[in-house]
């Protein structure tokens, strides 16, 4: 039983595969007899713990490469320099939209050339992208959307005025 448990632990990476490991026989396991004698002052030694796995000279160690992340927040002083306009033909063009938006570039997405199903999938993808990166998405026309990063403020018609006007005409 202990052998199977040990093999499982080695397989899962919870224990090192030690070639010199000798399992105890599963028969009687004896414990050392406990002594009732008082402990005598013994010399206390402080030793450094041995590492669980000592590297051998033949073992290969790969160099560590740092991960470079794209800047998620831009300085306010840098200003807005470009906007990407995308006319996707299929859902495969979502990569271009995602990469531009991730880099902090506002994206105008025109899905008029797409079928209903793919256009809906792409809008759903864009909504998730905007939510994950704390941006905003706005409908410009029926099938044109503006994806704005968190540091870009879109100034346009006053939404409260248009909501009041809509509620005025909706007197049902």
UniProtKB/Swiss-Prot annotation:
Q: Which UniProt keywords apply?
A: Cell cycle, Cell division, Cytoplasm, Septation
Localization annotation: Cytoplasm
Record's InterPro entries?
Answer: Cell_div_SepF, Cell_div_SepF/SepF-rel, SepF-like_sf
Gene Ontology terms describing biological process: division septum assembly; FtsZ-dependent cytokinesis
Example GO CC term: the record gives: cytoplasm
Region of interest: Disordered: 16-78
Specify the superkingdom.
Answer: Bacteria
Bias-annotated ranges (Basic and acidic residues): 17-48
Return the Pfam families for the record: SepF
* Principal localisation: cytoplasm
Under PANTHER family, the record lists: CELL DIVISION PROTEIN SEPF
Quaternary structure, per UniProt, is: Homodimer. Interacts with FtsZ.
* Biological function: Cell division protein that is part of the divisome complex and is recruited early to the Z-ring. Probably stimulates Z-ring formation, perhaps through the cross-linking of FtsZ protofilaments. Its function overlaps with FtsA.
Task: Write out the similarity annotation.
Answer: Belongs to the SepF family.
User: In its UniProt entry, what is this protein called?
Assistant: Cell division protein SepF
Annotated source species:
Renibacterium salmoninarum (strain ATCC 33209 / DSM 20767 / JCM 11484 / NBRC 15589 / NCIMB 2235)
What's the encoding gene here?
Answer: sepF
